[in-house]
């Protein structure tokens, strides 16, 4: 097996001796380290395999482009090491046979294949900052090592679920705390969605934002933040997420927005993601910021429509149209969608017609369709995906929210995904078993996680609102309103003002106030 490097500058070596692999130098920047290459494997003139991205680092490097041989080579020098982007990379090469993958991984000194290569770099800054930067890298090393020792390709099984323990803090002056999200399957209970609730200001969005950074490896402000785990860290075994999809339609979210330089923008344009990190939302980086500053703006309706069409195009390219229609079935049963002709919308291949239909939808319908389409477009399918959704109820009527939740769950089931939803909605809790609900509390500068006091699944909205969201009588104003009215008016006069008979609780309260007055 021979290797040649296609350099970004200067002359590049060539070879016509099969088999060989071409390593195309990328200009992606991992906080000063440029170690990314795209690999194409040529076994013959007709057998060509696009293998995707790999990282190659040197033990003695302090940054810049990885120094690579300027001539064809069969093995990298001692002190070099490589790692593929995901398990799919290793499975593709494994399927080509031992006579291919052994010289290939030996030649690139792959850390999943060669323990000595791993030992030579694992204490270096480049290993942590570049090689392990993106989500799932450590898990990929472990899984690939098992694969490459297996006598035959193991059968890929869908995950039975797992726990994710995450230690973080949500404000500079707050404590570090650990939250455990539980996705383990228990019988036929719906296990793929965890709900996160808490009062405004407790830090729910910040918690999800930190989790997105750590799970994906994208979004640290500086190299130092990455090295000191500024956003948090996983406790125990790292989760097996290949892709992280962030969904937020709040103008005030704190999620990291990709596209901070031209390299990132170009990659987003080509692939729709940055090494597995996907942001679906309202905010966009502004190009009008003064030098050295970063500001944001809200995306225009035309940009949102363009993103929807782009996601729909990716669904077609991935041949997932049928899966998308299955995912949309719960929405098709919602009365508000039955009037739209949703099936016709997605069956139409004329983007101008689709754009016109999308343009005429309500804001809630646009949000729902865009989210579900983007999830179907970007969710991995080959390895688990983490989906983080921040307060989806903002734009949605409760019945539409319930239908949306069913569609999200169907998408997660279809493609082996898992979601965490930060919410204030009792509708979402009504659809979620309490063992999959986490309550974030804050007192002064101390955060902690507690469990709901009741079983939330299938409970009435009123009980959930009172017992879980703590909306007691003291939190509402209707008592004061009725007390003021009852001091001057009879029950009959009050009901005449409303135009309908009051409910049991209101009538009882008015009568009790009238009794006090008459005494």
Label the predicted regions:
Residues 288-338, 344-346, 410, 427-431, ...:
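RecA-like P-loop NTPase motor core
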Residues 173-225, 232-235, 347-481:
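Switch/communication elements of ASCE P-loop NTPase nucleotide-binding domains
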Residues 117-188, 238, 251-261, 276-366, ...:
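Extended helical coiled-coil dimerization/tether regions that scaffold
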Residues 1-156:
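Long, basic/Gly/Ser/Thr-rich N-terminal segments
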């Amino acid at each position: 097996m021979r290797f040649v490097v296609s350099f970004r500058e200067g002359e590049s070596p060539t070879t016509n001796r099969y088999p060989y692999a071409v390593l195309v130098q990328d200009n992606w920047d991992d906080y000063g380290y440029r170690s990314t290459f795209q690999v194409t494997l040529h076994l013959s003139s007709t057998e060509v395999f696009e293998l995707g991205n790999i990282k190659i680092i040197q033990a003695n490097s302090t940054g810049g482009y990885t120094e690579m041989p300027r001539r064809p080579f069969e093995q990298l020098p001692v002190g070099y090491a490589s790692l593929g982007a995901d398990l799919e990379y290793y499975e593709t090469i494994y399927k080509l046979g031992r006579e291919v993958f052994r010289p290939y991984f030996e030649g690139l000194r792959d850390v999943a294949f060669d323990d000595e290569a791993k030992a030579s770099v694992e204490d270096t800054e480049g290993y942590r900052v570049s090689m392990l930067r993106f989500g799932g890298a450590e898990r990929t090393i472990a899984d690939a090592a098992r694969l490459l020792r297996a006598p035959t390709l193991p059968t890929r099984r869908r995950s039975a679920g797992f726990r994710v323990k995450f230690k973080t803090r949500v404000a500079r002056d707050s404590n570090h705390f650990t939250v455990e999200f539980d996705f383990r399957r228990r019988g036929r209970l719906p296990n793929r969605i965890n709900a996160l609730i808490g009062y405004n200001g407790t830090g729910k969005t910040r918690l999800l934002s930190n989790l997105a950074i750590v799970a994906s490896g994208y979004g640290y402000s500086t190299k130092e933040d990455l090295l000191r785990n500024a956003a948090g860290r996983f406790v125990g075994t790292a989760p097996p997420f290949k892709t992280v999809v962030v969904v937020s339609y709040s103008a005030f979210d704190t999620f990291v927005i990709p596209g901070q330089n031209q390299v990132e923008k170009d990659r987003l344009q080509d692939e729709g993601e940055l090494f597995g990190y996907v942001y679906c939302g309202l905010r966009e980086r502004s190009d009008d910021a003064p030098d050295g500053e970063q500001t944001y703006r809200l995306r225009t309706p035309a940009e949102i429509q363009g993103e929807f069409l782009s996601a729909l195009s990716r669904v077609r390219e991935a041949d997932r149209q049928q899966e998308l229609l299955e995912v949309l079935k719960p929405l098709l049963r919602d009365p508000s969608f039955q009037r739209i002709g949703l099936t016709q919308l997605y069956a139409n291949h004329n983007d101008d017609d689709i754009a016109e239909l999308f343009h005429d939808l309500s804001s809630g319908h646009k949000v729902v369709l865009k989210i579900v389409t983007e999830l179907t477009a970007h969710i991995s399918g080959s390895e688990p995906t983490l989906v983080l959704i921040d307060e989806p109820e903002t734009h949605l009527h409760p019945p539409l929210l319930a239908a949306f939740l069913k569609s999200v769950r169907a998408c997660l089931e279809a493609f082996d995904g898992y979601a965490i939803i930060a919410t204030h909605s009792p509708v979402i809790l009504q659809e979620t078993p309490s063992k999959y609900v986490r309550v974030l509390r804050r007192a002064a500068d101390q955060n902690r996680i507690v469990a709901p006091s009741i079983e939330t699944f299938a409970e009435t909205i009123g009980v959930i609102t009172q017992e879980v969201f703590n909306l007691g009588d003291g939190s509402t104003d209707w008592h004061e309103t009725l007390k003021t009215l009852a001091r001057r008016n009879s029950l009959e006069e009050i009901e005449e003002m409303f135009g309908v008979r009051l409910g049991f609780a209101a009538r009882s309260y008015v009568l009790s106030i009238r009794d006090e007055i008459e005494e």
